[in-house]
Amino acid sequence: MDTVLIHVLNSLLYASVMFLIAGGLSLIYGVMRIVNLAHGNLYAFGAYVTAWAVGAALGGAPQASLWLYALLPAGAVAAGALGAVLEPTLLRPLYRRAEEYQLLITFGLLLILEDLMRLIWGPYPLSISALYEALGSLAIGESIYPTYNLVVIVVGAAAAAGLWAFVYRTQFGVVLRATSQNMRMAAALGVNVNRVYVEAFSIGCFMAGLGGAIVVPQQGAVLGMGVDALILAFVVVVIGGLGSLEGALVGAVLVGAVRELGITFFPEIELAVLYLMAALVLLIRPAGLFGRV
């Protein structure tokens, strides 16, 4: 029973991080109809900023103080602020162009962000494992489980609930959904579409940055992590449906569960099983489980 609970917690841990990335990706597409290929590197950017901020505050001390955990959202804030700059400067001029232009500019942005992170922080990984170790472990029956992993699960669940409440229970959420349904009609009714777009893009980037920020104490920040995360985020949104927050949540939970089963029983083909699951969903429901045709 202890082993089963550990596997469930590991599934939820991975699902929490994947939802933060895929949820932001789906939000951006749902409102703006842009597939942001640079989204994974915004996740990596959040990880690097948090690792740098906490590392600078830690100052080489062997143990972390509790107040350092308040610096974890720094990467999310930085990613959101970067999104607020990128949307009006790089993306807005392309809304009336063909989708190929949007893919090219976001792919170029992916490469720029990768080189920018290499330039600022160098080619070597950044680690703040002291925050991961400082919380210790909890006893679950005869097993132990890292306490920080539970923090990640709680943050992921809180982010999912907060995003749902923001989109479906606030006035701006109504405007956001109206713009996603019909941008021209929303503009005709007096909605500032440009403001909606920049805020939606910033929120999506904030979520990606938050994913990187909460995972960096456990995994560290390393070049290339954004591309790996982007690929798996696309698996999530393919399963759940691109543009659907509910689909991103369900897809993240499914991917987390299948990945944990794969690591446990057939680690050699773990990723192949995820891609096969995504392919089967595409065959049965091309728009995903919750996607709109």
Give a label for each model feature.
Residues 144-222, 245-250:
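Helix-loop-helix "hairpin" substructures at the membrane interface of multi-pass membrane proteins
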